[in-house]
Amino acid sequence: DIRSDEYSNLEGAPKEIEKNPMLGDHGIRFSLKHPEIFKAELLAMKELADKGHKFGVMFPQIISVDEVKKAKAIFNELKINNVAFGVMIETPAAAILIKDICECGIDFASFGTNDLTQYTLAIDRGNEDVQDIYDEMNWAVLKQISRVIRECKKQGVESSICGQAGSKPEMVKFLIKQGIDSISVNADAAKEISELIQKLETDSQIEPINNKEDIKEELEEVKKSDEEVKKENMNPEPVEVIEESKKEDIFN
């Protein structure tokens, strides 16, 4: 899933960069428009699978059930066996349509939290002017994640998460309570997050949430906690001003 602003220097790549690459021609929409490239990529994966390598393939930028069905049809046409078929949940459209997407016969769904947050909040995380309001723990993002995990559980589809959010302890606690199957983390956070997950999964008080009332209560708790953290950041502890006469006493 490479955008036009990311591959412009590659040999044979189009030289024109789209005005808005983030919302442009990439992901599954590009693959379906160029079936010869798409099939070549899948055949390379098939070759690895036929040699006994175990892996899964997930398709990015899904916004419709039709895209999943078309990708699945090509996947089956090439007789790709022993390869898990999955989708990225990185657009609000995919989150909304998750029930129908699961019914297409997917094996797993993986959250792309970086893009899901950007698309949901209409925020460019690379823009310094709006960094203060870019937040994967935003109420709207969490509600989508919760809904997708619960639907995947019902349909027997595995759920996972990638992106930076999986390295945040507060997000991990939320995900474990929702019942997510796997979490991808940054290498430097792997030890801390692994220990946290072990604690959460062995803590008798931490149980998966299974009903609407508990889900609503948990979301409210996360929202309240997030607001308290932001409030603390906006109102730091007052700094004591030391008079000149006292400075001499301190440093002597």
Regions found by a protein language model. Give the residues of each.
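Conserved alpha/beta-domain cores
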Residues: 1-222, 226, 234, 242, ...
